[in-house]
């Protein structure tokens, strides 16, 4: 398949500064048990479809890969978030960990249940499949049920936990600018809803479909039967009134998926209508109308007698809004999450909040001391490692310097030897020349070299 061409001449290119500010993500599986689970593998692939386009879609994990390998590569690749799916070997529970790189924090959720994208499509009458054009822009994030303000029945710790979760979800996608963002570019919705009673968080992924609002299906059948005699009239023998046919009272909840709800109908001003009306007004202003002398004379008389009312510019400039319906088609996957804990760092820091385990003040102090000792030991090992690396580098540099010195001395010795051999060869050649010309008499007849007359 040929590669899709990207416009570069007329489209504004993203600067390196803007590219650096865009959050990127990795969706990975960690652990031997999760790598062997086929349904979890498909869930990871579906979740990568949600995080497109700023994610590694074709990332392949190996059994030898550890979490540290992915964390190390987050810096050079500019990855800001890690979504880690793990499965417990003992209980088989699936967990989702969302970590902010490089300093954390890490939010751990327990996946209570999930449904794959293919399972969602089986229950839909008209399922939707994503194209390459549908994932060119990130989805619209909708958070429902989260509150960052303190209520009467909540304490400060719950409010802080809510703020951490909301900020974590808000930063996984780049922020939208309403003045610059085109509405046609938003084609997906990622909805995160929290149940205030149970505390469960549900995730849904939808596709946005905008349609022109038309008349109902039954009225359309009546109009077709009127205009076309071959079309049959709807059967009305079971209807008590014509309103039951038009308003669909008998159908109830068994309406078609193509039918549009009244709550989803909005009035939208189309930009194409604005451009068309603007072009028509500009053409009418630019095209001159030729008039004869009699018409000009009559026009002047009419202008003197009657004052014509000119239409207001506001009435002509505003286009008539159209009714459009917004329909959401679920793409999948579905996830139901339950918060477990929040910890500092990337899966290796101090536990800031735990949903099921409550510690006393003495236990918290002991954990803080243990964590501080662990951090000191880690810093000490890091310094020792840096010193060892510096020593190895110094030994390597000294060895390299000695090798260069030996090479230089060897080159100088070879140069001196070649000089002695050259001097000896020069002396030998001069002596051989003397011996060769010793038999030639000195008073050689000069007439042999005289000019020819």
Curated annotation (Swiss-Prot):
Bias (Acidic residues)? 440-453
Q: Where is the composition biased (Basic residues)?
A: 1-11, 399-409
List the molecular function annotations (GO) for this entry.
rRNA binding
Tell me the superkingdom of the source.
Answer: Eukaryota
Indicate the quaternary assembly: Part of a complex that includes BRX1, RPF1, RPF2 and SSF1 or SSF2.
Could you share any additional remarks the record makes about this protein? Answer: Present with 1350 molecules/cell in log phase SD medium.
User: What is the official name of this protein in its record?
Assistant: Ribosome biogenesis protein SSF2
Organism of provenance? Saccharomyces cerevisiae (strain ATCC 204508 / S288c) (Baker's yeast)
